[in-house]
Amino acid sequence: MNQRDPSYDILFEPVQIGPVTAKNRFYQVPHCNGMGYMRPNTLAAMRGIKAEGGWAVVCTEEVEIRANSDNGSAAEGRLWDDGDIPALAKMTEAVHEHGALAGIELVHGGYSNANNYSRIPPIAPSAISVNSYAPVQARAMTKADIRDFRKWHRQAALRAKEADFDLVYVYAGHSLTLLMHFLSRRFNHRTDEY
């Protein structure tokens, strides 16, 4: 006997997302869980449980694309270089084992990250203080930095593909990302085309 209201049947139908098809409409959006790069086995098991429970798409938390986007004490995902691929591949394997798609959210924090771990000076569209509790100044990006920024995203997307992710997207919201900083007059005081 079906106890479900038929008006919700669409939730259980497949949906195409670009070149891939999710088996239903249950999409676990990116969220941090405190495991990230520090506990890849636990992260893979937790995301695998979601896939086993029926979610069609299971995503990472935000995944930093470069050491100059180090979110310090937050244990988020990292895809700084090829050495980070095996840890993320554990998650995709666990998710795929249950027939779900694996998604990854690429991010560069720009001025939002004081880079307490990497100690690399933060970058931003314009020179700006990082925040009130970290006495760090982000330096204004040059045009060469902007070209590198685009290159870092391409490299991270290729690494994500190598880790067997099905969906790759870029986090550009909540005033926490370099892309958002370029879009906001609050952070972007440039007078050139950027």
Task: Show where each model-derived region lies.
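N-terminal amphipathic alpha-helix/helix-capping segment at the start of soluble metabolic enzymes
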Residues: 1-27, 95
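N-terminal binding-site loop/beta-alpha segment at the start of enzyme catalytic domains
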Residues: 17-18, 25-41, 57
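Short, acidic/polar
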Residues: 38-51, 148-158
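Catalytic domains of carbohydrate-active enzymes, especially glycoside hydrolases
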Residues: 44-66, 162-168
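Aromatic- and acidic-residue-enriched carbohydrate-binding clefts of CAZyme catalytic domains
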Residues: 65-66, 70-79, 115-141, 179-194
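Non-globular sequence segments
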Residues: 93, 101, 107-165
